[in-house]
């Protein structure tokens, strides 16, 4: 945890010492009285130092400003529905990168029961977003959207006018690392069993271009994170 993230209400009232964030300060970082740690408030740009004091709760005070959070990058990532345990890891990593929006959708080869997982139905994903944002020292969280199928997902992002639309495709002759600097981008990644040819044709109709990041067959998790890091590195900071 490189940055403790709290809500505005937690800033006013403090958090329990049993909270995993408070426990991390003591058990992992080994903080003692009068040691400093960094915190930020969700949705606010400033990052502050705070003095740790053992008390009935962990209270926060803005001792002095030490910096500002990076903004989210104008990067959308569309992912064919995957196993919930894999989705959790992807959500955390994309939050640490500073992705703007993550969209999950069903495909022809998706296991449809995944959509009923609590991570997608009960807003369980927020804790994974926060964990990723704390790792990336970002005070902003990506938005997550669940869409019922591929076509609706493509329609949803059509109005955004992306400068580049990337379909991850192992056999493409174009390598993602070679793209120019851009202001915004969208990536679409197939589920663990990939897209059907019919789905690839539909994606092409929405002006996505195939790019490769490796000639090897990668797991969806690996491909999504690697492609997002590469693309994010090409985005011009706004």
From Swiss-Prot:
<protein>
    <recommendedName>
        <fullName>Ribosomal RNA small subunit methyltransferase E 1</fullName>
        <ecNumber>2.1.1.193</ecNumber>
    </recommendedName>
</protein>
<keyword id="KW-0808">Transferase</keyword>
<dbReference type="Pfam" id="PF04452">
    <property type="entry name" value="Methyltrans_RNA"/>
</dbReference>
<keyword id="KW-0698">rRNA processing</keyword>
<dbReference type="InterPro" id="IPR006700">
    <property type="entry name" value="RsmE"/>
</dbReference>
<comment type="similarity">
    <text>Belongs to the RNA methyltransferase RsmE family.</text>
</comment>
<dbReference type="InterPro" id="IPR029028">
    <property type="entry name" value="Alpha/beta_knot_MTases"/>
</dbReference>
<keyword id="KW-0949">S-adenosyl-L-methionine</keyword>
<dbReference type="Pfam" id="PF20260">
    <property type="entry name" value="PUA_4"/>
</dbReference>
<dbReference type="GO" id="GO:0005737">
    <property type="term" value="C:cytoplasm"/>
</dbReference>
<dbReference type="InterPro" id="IPR029026">
    <property type="entry name" value="tRNA_m1G_MTases_N"/>
</dbReference>
<comment type="function">
    <text>Specifically methylates the N3 position of the uracil ring of uridine 1498 (m3U1498) in 16S rRNA. Acts on the fully assembled 30S ribosomal subunit.</text>
</comment>
<dbReference type="InterPro" id="IPR046887">
    <property type="entry name" value="RsmE_PUA-like"/>
</dbReference>
<dbReference type="GO" id="GO:0070042">
    <property type="term" value="F:rRNA (uridine-N3-)-methyltransferase activity"/>
</dbReference>
<dbReference type="GO" id="GO:0070475">
    <property type="term" value="P:rRNA base methylation"/>
</dbReference>
<keyword id="KW-0963">Cytoplasm</keyword>
<dbReference type="InterPro" id="IPR046886">
    <property type="entry name" value="RsmE_MTase_dom"/>
</dbReference>
<keyword id="KW-0489">Methyltransferase</keyword>
């Amino acid at each position: 945890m490189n940055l403790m993230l709290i809500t505005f209400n937690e800033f006013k009232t403090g958090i329990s010492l049993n909270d995993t964030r408070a426990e991390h300060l003591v058990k992992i970082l080994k903080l003692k009285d009068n040691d400093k740690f960094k915190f930020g408030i969700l949705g606010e740009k400033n990052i502050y130092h705070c003095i740790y004091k053992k008390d009935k709760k962990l209270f926060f005070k803005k001792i002095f400003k030490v910096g500002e959070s990076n903004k989210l990058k104008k990067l959308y990532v569309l992912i064919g529905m995957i196993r919930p345990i894999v989705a959790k890891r992807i959500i955390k990593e994309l939050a640490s990168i500073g992705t703007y929006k993550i969209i999950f959708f069903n495909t022809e080869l998706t296991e449809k029961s995944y959509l009923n997982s609590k991570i997608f139905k009960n807003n369980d994903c927020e804790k994974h977003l926060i964990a990723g944002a704390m790792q990336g020292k970002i005070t902003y969280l990506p938005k997550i959207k669940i869409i019922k199928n591929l076509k609706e997902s493509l329609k949803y992002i059509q109005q955004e006018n992306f400068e580049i639309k990337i379909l991850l495709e192992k056999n493409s002759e174009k390598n993602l690392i070679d793209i120019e600097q851009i202001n915004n981008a969208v990536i679409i990644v197939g589920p663990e069993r990939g897209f059907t040819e019919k789905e690839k044709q539909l994606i092409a109709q929405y002006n996505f271009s195939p790019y490769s990041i490796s000639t090897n067959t990668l797991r969806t998790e690996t491909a999504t994170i690697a492609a997002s890091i590469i693309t994010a590195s090409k985005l011009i900071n706004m």
